[in-house]
């Protein structure tokens, strides 16, 4: 459940106080792309299951490759793009490596994918929109044509890193059963569009505001400075399990579920859906898992010792998500938006 870090308290959290309301340049000092990528990898593995494999398209860090090997297994990972850790730094100016433009032969990618065994297990992840060409040194291929190929040929899950302002080269991916996973805010907000199967991928063109209206002012855990807290999982757990949201709900005389349904109704979101079950397994101790879907947002797969606890944790996470994303007068008065 640590992968879905959407419960962030903007009134008390030191990460937000110290970095959340500063300019993009200042906030970038606390930005950690390795932590962001680790969080995203764990989220994909958690959501798509223990048999899932990874096909990463775009630039990447050597440590991200190492994390992917640990999370998915070295035999279940493929990276196609540019390893920025091998590039020389721009020592004449800032010492920061320049962001490479990843150019990919579209014909080679299609051939590589067609040769994969167990295609349905591979998560095709677009880390950044790659510049596709028809063949090495050939004419550019539009992203629309790439999406069309995915919708016709890709049988496994697809995750696309999407920008709240530009989408993916002005294309906005969606699809049957898709959901958005917010995970990064630098000078602009980015989120992952999760699609259960490539053949379900659809998209629209031109400006879209279905996500941006929910996330203006949202602060992300990737802004956190590692010097300010303990281990990563400990910080994640603390962020997700804060007691303030349930306490506020209790003061209003509502259960967690009632509070989520009330917020969803007030903001014209689709009716929240809870899914829970007993976890199959051979261990003596019974475990239960639960998650909640509300509008375009989905919680993590919460696991607990009792069904009631699992369901409460799932409702709590969704409540934290909605209360963090939706503007209200109290938050604006405190300067959180």
Curated annotation (Swiss-Prot):
GO cellular component: host cell cytoplasm; viral capsid
Protein location: Virion; Host cytoplasm
Keyword terms, alphabetized: Capsid protein, Host cytoplasm, Virion
Top-level taxon in the UniProt lineage: Viruses
Protein name as it appears in the record: Structural protein VP9
């Amino acid at each position: 459940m640590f992968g879905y870090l959407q419960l962030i308290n903007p009134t008390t959290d030191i990460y937000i106080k110290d970095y959340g309301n500063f300019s993009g340049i200042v906030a970038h000092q606390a930005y950690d792309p390795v932590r962001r990528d680790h969080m995203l990898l764990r989220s994909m593995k958690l959501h798509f299951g223990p048999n899932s494999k990874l096909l990463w398209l775009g630039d990447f860090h050597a440590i991200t490759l190492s994390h992917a090997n640990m999370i998915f297994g070295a035999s279940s990972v493929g990276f196609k793009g540019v390893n920025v850790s091998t590039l020389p730094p721009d020592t004449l100016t800032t010492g920061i490596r320049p962001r490479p433009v990843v150019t990919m032969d579209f014909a080679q990618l299609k051939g590589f994918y067609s040769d994969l065994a167990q295609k349905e297990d591979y998560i095709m992840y677009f880390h950044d929109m790659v510049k596709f060409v028809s063949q090495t040194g050939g004419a550019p291929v539009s992203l629309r044509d790439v999406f069309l190929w995915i919708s016709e040929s890709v049988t496994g899950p697809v995750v696309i890193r999407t920008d709240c302002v530009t989408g993916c080269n002005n294309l906005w991916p969606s699809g049957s059963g898709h959901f958005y996973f917010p995970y990064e805010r630098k000078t602009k907000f980015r989120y992952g569009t999760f699609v259960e199967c490539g053949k379900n991928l659809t998209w629209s063109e031109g400006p879209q505001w279905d996500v941006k209206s929910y996330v203006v002012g949202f602060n992300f855990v990737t802004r956190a400075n590692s010097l300010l807290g303990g281990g990563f999982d400990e910080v994640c757990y603390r962020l997700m399990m804060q007691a303030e949201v349930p306490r506020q709900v209790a003061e209003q005389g509502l259960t967690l579920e009632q509070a989520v349904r009330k917020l969803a109704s007030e903001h014209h979101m689709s009716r929240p859906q809870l899914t829970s079950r007993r976890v199959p397994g051979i261990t003596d101790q019974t475990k239960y898992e639960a998650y909640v879907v509300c509008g375009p947002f989905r919680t993590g797969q919460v696991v607990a010792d009792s069904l009631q606890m699992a369901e409460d944790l799932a409702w709590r996470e969704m409540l934290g998500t909605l209360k963090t994303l939706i503007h209200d007068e109290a938050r604006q008065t405190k300067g959180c938006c």
